[in-house]
């Protein structure tokens, strides 16, 4: 069994200095009932904690590290860029290089604006949707996470397509009432929302594959009908591809599903592990943003040289062949985990979208947040701890998927599946 003495000491030192001792809630490991593990370094598909323990990593910084940790080319180019200066507060050619690559590969994006996080991207996209349409309301889906902006930290009201309620203290009810929340994959609720509020509906924002309630792909026809309804109503369709961008496919989820939204939000992979976000779309919409148009958005570090370098050097290495590899590797992982769960009669459901794999401890097909919430969270916490001690780093939440990188191998997958077999054997005693 691994020991975490140094991590425990580090957490005790951090707790009085930062809320909960961390800078993002899921890192606190509360949902798995243990103190967080403090990491020191990573290389390829492996990560190492401050106690010297080694793990195969399926967190990958929550998705950005599609080339694995400390990719040689990314690191070398970052060193070169750093020596020239870390930030200028002025345009650089690095921004243009990354913008060209994003526009080339993302079907919906004709013009792109770089920002510093996925939350900035979604907040800015909503402001743009409202400013462009002259409408106020936004439709989102239960279980889809779009960052921590006030307009998006909203839960559903008591009835279908009712006005939203704040999902966090500090979010004013007046803000929440302009956000409608309906179940993911539920077209009947979407149609009802359009019937009731269509005249004031500025945008529909959706993760084309929901990645923050596990990995939940869209049901056949779901995205197609969202596209039809929004076009018919003059509402903007916004794909939040902060997580799915360049993970679900070479041309992102929209390319994989053949659905082109009006606006797309990106992050994670396009920063190669550095803080970044972006939003883009049709030229006629994007030209409403300052300084081209009247809708304001700005950022001191937007388009900074380091993030642009890491993003460009990441994307330029990705090829169509990588995504074929992810399909093979992802299937091997999902099918392997399912097989060992069946060996021990453990209720489960697996899902996959590109290099994202979901593994739920429920006997339901997971197609929305209610289904995901039926998972056995207590069992997941025990499974997480067993896997950690066996050398596998999983996201510390049942509602997060596993991420693959180009550095993961079939041997890594087989090791992980065997670890799951050992974990289930212990847990079923």
Swiss-Prot record:
Cofactor: pyridoxal 5'-phosphate
EC code: 5.4.3.8
Main location: cytoplasm
Subcellular location: Cytoplasm
Principal EC category: isomerase
Record bears the keyword ATP-binding: no
Keyword Iron recorded: no
GO molecular function terms listed in the Swiss-Prot or TrEMBL record: glutamate-1-semialdehyde 2,1-aminomutase activity; pyridoxal phosphate binding; transaminase activity
One of the Pfam families matching this protein, by short name: Aminotran_3
N6-(pyridoxal phosphate)lysine: residues carrying this PTM: 268
Keywords, alphabetical: Cytoplasm, Isomerase, Porphyrin biosynthesis, Pyridoxal phosphate
NCBIfam families xrefs: hemL, PRK00062.1
Family per similarity comment: Belongs to the class-III pyridoxal-phosphate-dependent aminotransferase family. HemL subfamily.
UniProt-recorded name of the protein: Glutamate-1-semialdehyde 2,1-aminomutase 2
């Amino acid at each position: 069994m691994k020991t975490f003495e140094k991590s425990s000491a580090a957490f005790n030192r951090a707790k009085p200095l930062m809320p909960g001792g961390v800078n993002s809630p899921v890192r606190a490991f509360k949902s798995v009932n243990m103190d967080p593990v403090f990491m020191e370094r990573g290389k390829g598909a492996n990560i190492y904690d401050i106690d010297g323990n080694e793990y195969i990593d399926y967190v990958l910084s929550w998705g950005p590290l599609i080339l694995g940790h400390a990719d040689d080319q990314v690191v070398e180019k970052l060193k070169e860029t750093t020596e020239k200066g870390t930030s200028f507060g002025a345009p650089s050619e690095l921004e243009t290089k990354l913008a060209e690559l994003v526009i080339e590969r993302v079907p919906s994006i004709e013009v792109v604006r770089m920002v510093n996080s996925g939350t900035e991207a979604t907040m800015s996209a909503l402001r743009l949707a409202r400013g462009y349409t002259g409408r106020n309301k936004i439709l989102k889906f239960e279980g889809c996470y779009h960052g921590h902006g006030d307009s998006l930290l909203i839960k559903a009201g008591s009835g279908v397509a009712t006005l939203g309620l704040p999902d966090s203290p500090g979010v004013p009810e007046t803000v929440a009432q302009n956000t409608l929340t309906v179940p993911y994959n539920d077209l009947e609720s979407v149609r009802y929302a359009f019937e009731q509020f269509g005249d004031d509906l500025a945008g529909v924002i959706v993760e084309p594959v929901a990645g923050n309630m596990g990995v939940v792909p869209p049901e056949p026809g779901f995205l197609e009908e969202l596209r039809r309804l929004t076009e018919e109503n003059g509402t903007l369709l916004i794909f939040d591809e902060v997580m799915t961008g360049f993970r679900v496919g070479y041309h992102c989820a929209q390319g994989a599903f053949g659905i082109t939204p009006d606006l797309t939000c990106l992050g994670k992979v396009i920063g190669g592990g550095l803080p970044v976000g972006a939003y883009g779309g049709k030229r006629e919409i994007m030209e409403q943003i300052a300084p081209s148009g009247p809708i304001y958005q700005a950022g001191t570090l937007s388009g900074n040289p380091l993030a642009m370098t890491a993003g460009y050097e990441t994307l330029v290495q990705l090829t169509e062949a990588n995504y074929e590899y992810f399909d093979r590797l992802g299937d091997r992982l999902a099918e392997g985990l399912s097989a060992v769960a069946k060996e021990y009669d453990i209720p489960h459901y697996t899902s996959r979208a590109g290099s994202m794999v979901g593994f739920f401890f429920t006997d339901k097909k997971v197609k929305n947040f209610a289904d995901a919430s039926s998972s056995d969270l207590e069992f997941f916490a025990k499974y997480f701890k067993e896997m950690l001690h066996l050398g596998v780093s999983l996201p510390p939440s049942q509602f997060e998927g596993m991420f693959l990188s180009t550095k993961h191998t079939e041997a890594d997958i087989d090791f992980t599946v065997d670890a799951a077999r050992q974990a289930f054997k212990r847990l079923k005693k």
